[in-house]
């Protein structure tokens, strides 16, 4: 077995665990009984710990180092590079902290849904504070040059920094605020009036499905459900892409706009090359 085949064996195991986590998270958002949150938190913590164990194993680290010095195809080189970057971050964070974060975020999501439904911020505040404290610990473990948020930002935007974002946002604000003032000065037009009324959720769902089909979303490799807040989840491959929207009886636009937005994410996920799944 070649080193790259050994790599695929390891990374496929990681990918399988992450896919299971994705499915559990989707289930929590769409249909899990509210009383199951403690059990689900524990499951997510165990799976997250197993991912961390594989990623941080010395043998896997040595394998990635060997592969970094080998002649590989472009796709293989990128896969190894990105996996090595993820591992370099993972080895700095204790497994216990990874598991604590998984439990805290799972529990907090359920509390957030309740707090939003009851319009009661105080229900969610303690859970959010706990997550912030855990994220601070994570940032300190990973390390940073300027701001603690830099350590977390690079997980999604490699090479990006807080200071650079502040500069970009300041530039956007300088242009957008005057534009917004001009728009406000023109007065408002209620373009959404036709979308306001009393719309059955079942009717809204049918309209969203038709809309998604029109833009090319493949329902043989995806589905649409409802949740407190819209999201898109790719469960391990480009043939299992799950979208959600939130239905509001008095506002048809909320669901339609969400369907278009999430549908865009869904088209991206379904369009990813099948041969790269699991890498």
Regions found by a protein language model. Give the residues of each.
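Contiguous, non-catalytic segments that form substrate-binding/exosite surfaces or channel walls
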Residues: 104-254
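Short acidic-hydrophobic sequence patches enriched in Asp/Glu that either
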Residues: 39, 168, 259
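A well-structured
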Residues: 1-160
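Secondary-structure transition/capping residues
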Residues: 18, 58, 119, 187, ...
């Amino acid at each position: 077995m070649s080193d790259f085949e050994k790599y695929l064996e390891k990374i496929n195991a990681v990918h399988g665990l992450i896919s299971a986590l994705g499915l559990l998270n989707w289930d929590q958002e769409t249909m899990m009984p509210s009383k199951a949150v403690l059990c689900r938190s524990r499951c997510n913590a165990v799976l997250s710990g197993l991912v961390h164990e594989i990623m941080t194993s010395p043998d896997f680290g040595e394998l990635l180092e060997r592969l970094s010095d080998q002649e590989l195809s472009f796709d293989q080189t990128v896969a190894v590079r990105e996996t090595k970057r993820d591992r370099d971050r993972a080895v700095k964070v204790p497994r216990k902290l990874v598991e604590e974060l998984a439990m805290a975020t799972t529990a907090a999501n359920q509390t957030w849904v309740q707090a939003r439904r009851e319009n009661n911020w105080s229900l969610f505040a303690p859970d959010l504070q706990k997550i912030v404290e855990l994220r601070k610990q994570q940032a300190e473990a990973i390390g940073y040059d300027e701001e603690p948020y830099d350590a977390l930002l690079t997980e999604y935007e490699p090479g990006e920094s807080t200071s650079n974002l502040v500069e970009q946002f300041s530039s956007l604000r300088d242009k957008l605020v005057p534009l917004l003032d001009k728009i406000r000065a023109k007065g408002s037009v209620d373009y959404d009036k036709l979308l306001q009324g009393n719309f059955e959720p079942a009717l809204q769902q049918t309209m969203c499905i038709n809309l998604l089909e029109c833009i090319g979303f493949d329902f043989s490799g995806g589905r649409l459900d409802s949740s407190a807040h819209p999201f898109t989840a790719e469960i391990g491959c480009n043939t299992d892409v799950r979208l959600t929207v939130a239905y509001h009886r008095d506002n048809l636009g909320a669901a339609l706009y969400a369907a278009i937005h999430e549908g865009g994410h869904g088209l991206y996920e379904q369009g990813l090359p099948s041969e790269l799944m699991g890498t």
